[in-house]
Design a protein with these regions (language model features):
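Short-chain dehydrogenase/reductase
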Residues: 73, 91, 107-108
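Domain-scale signature associated with acetyltransferase and cell-envelope carbohydrate enzymes
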Residues: 1-71, 78-80, 88, 104, ...
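Hydrophobic alpha-helical segments of small multi-pass membrane proteins
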Residues: 64, 94-97, 107
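Conserved switch/coupling elements of ABC/ABC-like ATPase nucleotide-binding domains
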Residues: 112-115
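Beta-rich strand-turn-strand
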Residues: 78-92, 96-100
């Protein structure tokens, strides 16, 4: 059985190395218009290279390229629309609608993909937070009930933590 990445490549999507497509829906019909860089994670989101809103009236759907750079994370429930470029080192927050180009080194959220900070600042902030918060080195699916109980208490007190 082919992986999601292999299926996308077979449909013409250009995909780099170290790409995770976690329940992501990639526009297979227009895969040749989509490029995904290296070190990209797309979680439970949709990437579209077409817009069929014109099809009934005009007999044609609008199409456009989608270019996703390197070192990009696209959060749960996001929608990437046609004719956009997402730069390098970008975090697209959960539920974001990307309908315009996103520059390098930013974090965007919301229905208008509002820039709320830089990728570098976000990573630095979390790197420092890891020194204060619980960090679990046991994969979530391998934790025992006792490990979950301990982690829950620590995460509740520290208002967050980190897991593999």
């Amino acid at each position: 059985m082919m992986t999601k990445v292999e299926q996308c490549r077979a449909r013409g999507v250009k995909i780099g190395d170290n790409v995770d497509l976690v329940n992501a829906e990639i526009d297979y019909c227009f895969g040749h218009l989509i490029t995904i860089g290296n070190n990209v994670t797309i979680t439970n989101s949709v990437v579209l290279a077409h817009d069929a809103s014109t099809h009934k009236e005009l007999g044609y759907s609008k199409i456009g390229c989608v270019d996703i750079g390197d070192n990009v994370f696209i959060g749960y429930g996001s929608i990437i629309l046609p004719n956009v470029r997402i730069g390098n080192k970008v975090i697209v927050g959960a539920g974001t609608v990307v309908s315009k180009d996103i520059p390098d080194n930013v974090v965007v959220v919301g229905p208008n993909a509002k820039i709320i900070g830089t990728y570098d600042d976000y990573m630095d902030k979390n790197r420092n937070r890891m020194k204060e918060c619980p960090v679990s080195n046991v994969l979530f699916c391998d934790k025992t009930e006792a490990e979950w109980d301990t982690l829950y208490k620590e995460v509740k007190v520290k208002k967050g933590g980190f897991d593999l």
